[in-house]
Amino acid sequence: MIEVTLLGTGSPIPDPNRAGPSTLVRAGGQVFLVDCGRGVLQRAAAVGVGAAGLSTLLLTHLHSDHVGDLGDVLITRWVSTFTPDPVPLPIIGPPGTAELVAATLNALRHDIGYRIAHHADLNAPPAVDVREHTDGPVWDRDGVSIRVAPTDHRPVAPTIGFRVDYQGASVVLAGDTVPCAGLDELAAGAGALVHTVIRKDIVATIPQQRLQDICDYHSSVEQAAATAARAGVGTLVMTHYVPALVAGQEEQWRALAAREFAGRVELGDDLHRVQVDAPS
């Protein structure tokens, strides 16, 4: 069984009810944080997960709304890990990830220096193990395997999706993308597909061109559902709603997805959980 928790279902626009894009995946006793938008650690704390308990951080792409709390994750893990010789935090993302992590740590160098000067048991900066990938296997530990494939969020490039497999259960996390062959291949036969969705029918009516531009490189509800149908997944989990999902409108979103996908559709607020089982 794999458990998926939508930690943050919001967008770049601050929302009092939704944290920034982030998803927690638990499998085989391991805890994977996929993206780290604003407020991610508060949401993780609500389900009993702290930064020190993360097995790895997986980044789909380097847009600010998906990495906005990277510094908080790095520093909080560092100061809340009390074992000697802590294991470096594995961080897996597309090319550019190493530069982002290094720049983030550099920006926090004063804070890091203050803490090292103050605490005798903090004698080195936060330890990280950054690996950049665009395709293929990236993780294989205690029965949990993860592989990535390229997605299409151009002009943001490269971008990747993740597939987590454990004891016959499988979950794919698409990140931000339009329909593409890489995601179709990655999601083929998966138990669940976690996919960003936008309501293009609503966004297209906004007068500001900058906001209309987001239609160019995100999937609509119908497009995400069509991807799920092509791939033959069991469940479509919608997240990163643009505009924000309003209470009472859930059935509108479900109806749009149902035009293309006959399977189970999950959507909801932050902390919504979905259990993905192996086929019986």
Curated annotation (Swiss-Prot):
Example of a GO MF term: metal ion binding
A Pfam short name: Lactamase_B_2
Enzyme Commission (EC) number: 3.1.26.11
Domain of life of the organism encoding this protein: Bacteria
CDD domains in the record: arylsulfatase_AtsA-like_MBL-fold (cd07719)
Residues forming the catalytic site: D65
Chain residues that bind Zn(2+) 1: H61, H63, H153, D176
Binding site for Zn(2+) 2: D65, H66, D176, H240
Keywords: Endonuclease, Hydrolase, Metal-binding, Nuclease, tRNA processing, Zinc
Reaction(s) the record says it catalyses: Endonucleolytic cleavage of RNA, removing extra 3' nucleotides from tRNA precursor, generating 3' termini of tRNAs. A 3'-hydroxy group is left at the tRNA terminus and a 5'-phosphoryl group is left at the trailer molecule
InterPro entries: AtsA-like_MBL-fold, Metallo-B-lactamas, RibonucZ/Hydroxyglut_hydro, RNase_Z/BN
Family: Belongs to the RNase Z family.
Quaternary organization: Homodimer.
Function noted in UniProt: Zinc phosphodiesterase, which displays some tRNA 3'-processing endonuclease activity. Probably involved in tRNA maturation, by removing a 3'-trailer from precursor tRNA.
Protein name, UniProt field: Ribonuclease Z
Gene that produces this protein: rnz
